[in-house]
Amino acid sequence: MFAESYGIGANDLANAFGTSVSAKALKYWQAVLVAAVFEFLGAVLLGANNTDTMKSGVADPKAFESRPEILMYGMLCVMIAAAFWDIFSCTLELQVSTTHTTAGALMGMALASYGSDAVIWSASSSTFPGASALFMGWGTSPILAMFFSGTLFFLVRTFVMRSKDPFTRALWVMPLAVWLTVFVIVFTVIQTGNKNKTWDTVANGTAVWISVVVAVGISVSSALVFIPFMKRTIAVKDAEQYLQVFSACTMSFAHGANDVANAMGPFAAVYYIWQNSEVPGSKVPVPTWILAFGGVGIVIGLATYGWHIMGLYGAKSVMISNSRGFCIELATAMTVIFAARWGIPISTSHTCVFAAVAVGCFEGWRGVNWFMVLQTICAMFITL
C-alpha cells in the first residue's frame, strides 16, 4: 500500500505541481509543504467516496463471494503491479496515469480470476457505472479541462493582461478567483459528505448558501490581507503569483481527493476481508487512518522521488507563466473535484496536460509541444 501511494506521489503528484515549479510560483520544497497539508486534507475529506469506487466499481465483488481469499490476494497483486509500474515509469521519466494503472490492474486481476464476468463493464448507478465510465473519462476529462482552462485564460488575458491597467485588474480578479475556488471545494465537501453520512441532513439548497457564505468570507479576508501587501509591488506577475499559489493549494486538495483512492481502494478491500472473512459489499466504510496513510505516502513520494519528472511536464509541454499556470491548475482542480464528486476516477496528469494544451493554443499551434501530447496519449493506452 505504501509503495503504491509512494509511486503516485513521485509520478502523478509531481506532474500536478509541474506548472507551479516551472513558473517559479513555488520552489520544490515549498511544493512539498503545500502537498503535505492539502493532499492530506483532500484525502481525508473527499477520498472516501472515490476509494469505495475503485474498490468495488471495477471488479465485481459478487464473483468472489465463494472465495474471498482470491479477491484479497488479487488486490495485493493489484497494489504490487501498480506500485512497480508507477515507480519504474518515474525512473524512466515517463509520465503515466496512476488512475489508469490501478484500474487496468483491477481489470486484469478480475479477468485472470473469473473471466469477463468478474468485471463490471457497465451498471445503472448515480455515480460510477462500472469500467465503461473509466473509458468515458478519457474523453470527458480532457474536454472539461480544455474548456475550463481555455475559458479562464481567455478571460484573464482579455480583461487583465491586455487591459490599460493590468495590475489593478489583477487585484480585482484575485478575490473573484478565490471565491470561485472556495465555493467549488466547500460545496463538493458537503455533497460528498452526504454520501459518507457526515452531512446527511444538509439539502442541496442549504449546501449552496453555506458554500457561498464561506467563499465570500475567505475571499474578503484574502483581499483585506493580500491586496494592501501586493499594492507595494509594481509587477502584474507578482499579483498573479499569489493566485497561482492559491490554485496550487486547490490542485493539491483535488489530487488528494481523487488519487488517494488508487492506492487505498485495493487495500481497503484487503483490510475488510482480513477482518470479516467475507467479500465487501458496494458500500463499506473506509477507516480514516487508511486515507491518512495514503496521503502521507503520496507526499513522501513527491518529496523524495518526484524530482525525476517534476519539470518534465511544466518545462516541455507549453510556455508556463504565472497567469497560464493559474488557469491550468484551477481548471484541473475543478475537473478533478467534479469527477471526485460523482465518483469518476480520472487521471490528474492527463487532465493537467490537456488543460495546458488549451492555454498553449492561444499562442498558435506552435505554442504546444504536440509530440509530448502524443506521448501522453500513447502512455495512457500502454499503462492500461
Q: What is each of the regions a protein language model found here?
A:
Residues M1-L384:
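Alpha-helical transmembrane segments and immediately membrane-proximal extracytoplasmic
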